[in-house]
Amino acid sequence: MIVVTGGAGFIGSNIVKGLNEAGEENIIVVDNLSNAEKHLNLNSLSIADYIDKDEYLQKLNKFQNVKAIFHQGACSSTTEQDGKYMMSNNYEYSKTLLNYCLENSIDFLYASSASVYGNGKAGFVEKREAEYPLNVYGFSKFAFDNYVRRVLPQVKSQVLGLRYFNVYGPQENHKGRMASVAFHLFHQLQETGKMRLFEGSGSFRRDFIHVADTVKINLHFYESKTSGIFNAGTGKARSFEDIATALQSLHGSGEIESIPFPEDLRGKYQEFTEAGLDKLRAAGYSKEFMSLEEGVQQYYEQLSATDGRFV
């Protein structure tokens, strides 16, 4: 049996799909369906059971023969200001799951984030000196990564953290403001014929990775049983304008407008990210990543055909 927390969410549901395609259907999805729209992410997937995230913690020891937990569940809002909630949901919950896995020799693969790097002045490499998060979401991930670092030398089962960079692709419809730039620009283009970018977006560059590539990385490490903390990005920073231009080309038209930069993001916004891949490659992950143009085209076609959902 495999458990996927956040399995009704964006990356989690894509991991469930990847496991299904690999022949695995004995999967428990753990999530919070307060946002009822998320059930749509599960409609076409094969799972054995669903359980609420809070109820799951209360019943941990009742589940037998669990061989791995893909821990993808978290509050992923980079603008959330309730630090107590963030640390309870992202840090304490993760520690409880990790310690349960260590006590029961269950493989534990979890979602970290490139947000731990902050402005990236010290580079985007998996080293403590490169980490200085700009918001409490990033801090919650940073704190758990450092907790993991302290226990790694003693672990006997797999403990694997992946620092996701800017992930885009199907099944993110429920994320609202936190959905990818590609998602928002597509819908702006469809609704108004225009795409709105923050002032300065020509110089904002991020490492955009298609969700299908993050699934491949997860499944690679699930098979290899490697432990550690690794970047999950493409190693190539691209501008927000590059996404708009790609969509413009696919759509055949579309103006690009500048809008004021939101005040609530000032000082908390990563203007540049680019994953260092040396550690990932050294761990045996050799697959090539989708180019931005290829990924945006694939996503454009999915959004046009199915509103970006699995069917």
Where are each of the predicted segments found?
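NAD(P)-dependent short-chain dehydrogenase/reductase
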Residues: 122, 146-220, 246-248
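Glycine-rich phosphate-binding loop and adjoining beta1-alpha1-beta2 segment
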Residues: 29-56
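SDR active-site strand-loop-helix element
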Residues: 5, 30, 69-73, 108-114, ...
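C-terminal substrate-binding subdomain of Rossmann-fold SDR/epimerase-dehydratase oxidoreductases
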Residues: 190-311
